[in-house]
From Swiss-Prot:
It comes from Viola hederacea. This is Cycloviolacin-H4. SUPFAM superfamilies: Cyclotides. There is a cross-link at residues 1-30 (Cyclopeptide (Gly-Asn)). Keywords: Cytolysis, Disulfide bond, Hemolysis, Knottin, Plant defense.
Amino acid sequence: GIPCAESCVWIPCTVTALLGCSCSNNVCYN
């Protein structure tokens, strides 16, 4: 997928999750 410029190591994807991004390998991907 496309990296969403947000990490999810300590907390889940927040703002980017609203854009359809999900956590994968500690990074939010679209």
